[in-house]
Amino acid sequence: MSSTTPAPQTVYQWTADVAVRFLKEWNFLLGIILLFITIILQFGYTSRSMFIYVVKMIILWLMWPLTIVLCIFNCVYALNNVYLGFSIVFTIVSIVMWIMYFVNSIRLFIRTGSWWSFNPETNNLMCIDVKGTVYVRPIIEDYHTLTATNVRGHLYMQGVKLGTGFSLSDLPAYVTVAKVSHLCTYKRAFLDKVDGVSGFAVYVKSKVGNYRLPSNKPSGADTALLRI
């Protein structure tokens, strides 16, 4: 009987020549992908296009699992022990931060009941009750004042369009901004009519507490907030 010797396995090494060849082969596709992501991140705002903003949120959300997969890949195919150590640290940090994101998002969802709570860009959700409907929209910063603008029936809150068919009399007395740890209440301090169908209102932060939004409440009822 003749003994068979197993063929040696090919060991792939990532060298400078391999990297250059990879870029030459995939340069065009990578350029298109990066250009698409750059345009989405640059122009993805709720005040411009809600569709582009949602696409932006999907891209940002996919960054975490993609980062974790790449870190695990680096752990499996580490060049040496130094790279392995850094890869393990980066993997742990990525997983911990992703878990923290889900924990904070679930806490915010419990407070507001809105799927915008899983927005990876911000943990500030503006909530306004107009005609019995609670509109929830993400805002980037913690503002001291909020502005509602009505232009011939088109209602905008901080530049974000909420809908049509509204008047200044439909604006509530209070607006809230939900955060992970607390809820900020804004009281209407100023209302001015530009003409018969247009105008604006300014809301000023008046109270901060650990509340959640009830499922149904009268328009502008500050006392309807539920403590948690």
Curated annotation (Swiss-Prot):
GO terms for molecular function: structural constituent of virion. Its main location: virion. InterPro entries: M_CoV, M_HCoV-like. It is found in: Virion membrane; Host Golgi apparatus membrane. Residues 2-25, 78-85 are virion surface. Residues 47-56, 107-228 are intravirion. GO terms for cellular component: host cell Golgi membrane; membrane; viral envelope; virion membrane. The chain crosses the membrane at residues 26-46, 57-77, 86-106. Keywords: Glycoprotein, Host Golgi apparatus, Host membrane, Host-virus interaction, Membrane, Transmembrane, Transmembrane helix, Viral envelope protein, Viral immunoevasion, Viral matrix protein, Virion. CDD domains: HCoV-like_M. The keyword Signal does not apply. It is a multi-pass membrane protein. Belongs to the betacoronaviruses M protein family. Component of the viral envelope that plays a central role in virus morphogenesis and assembly via its interactions with other viral proteins. Homomultimer. Interacts with envelope E protein in the budding compartment of the host cell, which is located between endoplasmic reticulum and the Golgi complex. Forms a complex with HE and S proteins. Interacts with nucleocapsid N protein. This interaction probably participates in RNA packaging into the virus. This is Membrane protein. It comes from Rat coronavirus (strain 681).
